[in-house]
Regions:
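Bacterial Sec signal peptide processing site at the extreme N-terminus
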Residues: 17-30
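Conserved active-site segments centered on acidic
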Residues: 36
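Sec-dependent signal peptide recognition
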Residues: 2-8
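Compact alpha-helical subdomains of small soluble proteins
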Residues: 51-116
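A ubiquitous short alpha-helical element
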Residues: 27, 48-53
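Hydrophobic/aromatic beta-strand elements that line small-molecule binding cavities or substrate pockets
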Residues: 33
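C-terminal motif of bacterial Sec signal peptides marking the signal peptidase cleavage site
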Residues: 12-15
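N-terminal alpha-helical signal peptides/signal-anchor transmembrane segments
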Residues: 39-43
Length: 116
């Protein structure tokens, strides 16, 4: 009985192990870093507008994100799948955010806060 339990446990644990490489439909790290940087710029720009209601700001942020995704030939579902994948793989996410920071630093030096 104990051998069967150990065998089942080993089988289960080996089945849980997954390939950590991104699936084909996931946005590549470099492009994801640009998209995330754009999203941060969009959100930061709108957080400065205090005259707007929260609902209005949310609608505008979502619209600007959709425009940005369209410009980069990405849809929101693919972005969300990619973000979910990367957020569950800390090594990838750390590399992406290092690139996000570099991207934002370059924009700051150029005073290019548009993001779009």
């Amino acid at each position: 009985m104990q051998k069967s339990l150990i065998f089942i446990l080993v089988l289960f644990l080996s089945a849980c192990g997954s390939d950590d490489s991104p699936p084909e439909d996931i946005i590549p790290e470099e492009k994801m870093a640009v998209l995330i940087a754009d999203v941060h710029v969009i959100e930061a720009r709108l957080s400065k507008i205090s005259l707007m209601s929260l609902d209005s700001a949310t609608i505008i942020v979502e619209r600007l994100k959709m425009d940005n995704f369209k410009k980069n030939k990405v849809d929101s579902a693919q972005y969300n799948r990619s973000y979910k994948f990367y957020s569950t793989h800390p090594d990838y996410l750390e590399r992406i955010y290092k690139n996000v920071i570099k991207n934002l630093e370059k924009r700051f030096k150029k005073k290019d806060y548009r993001g779009l």
